Amino acid sequence: MLNARLNELKETPQPPFIYAVTEDGNFFLSKTKDAFTGIAVSKEDGIDTALSALTREIERVRQFGFTASEYARAKADYLRQLESAYNERDKVKNNAYVNEYVRHFIDNEPIPGIDAEYAIMNQIAPNIPVEAINSFIPSLVNDSNIVVNIFCPEKEGMKYPTEQEIMDVLNKVKAEKLTAYEDKVSDEPLIAEQPKAGTIVKTEEGPFGSTVLTLSNG
């Protein structure tokens, strides 16, 4: 859900970053440590802007959580993907099983099998309220033990941010008075009124064996 918000920012006319994503899992330098991680890719002169935007959206989620409509969409998407995996369970390639066993051995990831996972999660997921998700977020995203890594090309004229400049960005966002995210989803139909059906007034042969139809309504 947070990644969906970041994707919205990426699609704005003047996006604050080229790409951004968050995840919770292994710390990228160590598989023995779990960490909530935010990643932003920026232009060479947009490091501060990207870091600010990423930090701001993470902080917004920490303060206000997710909306019921966001959660409903995310839950529906998850259950739809789970159902698709269940329906395609007889078409799984061998490498998918190999990768699953590797993750089980290295990361201790459970491997109940899609039949059990489908049955279990269809009982559990619908009964987890958004309030439970939001109450968990502060324990996942907090102010302790924060690590910031900046990866930049080594080139002449490149301005590398200092530790103090990075701290200033984080502190500035922390001091902002944020507002809750507004989920601007419309339930209005794409077309308010269905156009009247036209008729085919002309048929021509097109390129590559295609047929070009001219309709009465344009």
How should each PLM-predicted stretch be described?
Residues 1-2, 218:
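Active/ligand-binding-proximal structured segments within catalytic/core domains
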Residues 7, 72-76, 80-83, 103-218:
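Proteolytic maturation boundary segments
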Residues 2-130, 145-153:
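M16 family metallopeptidases and their MPP-like homologs
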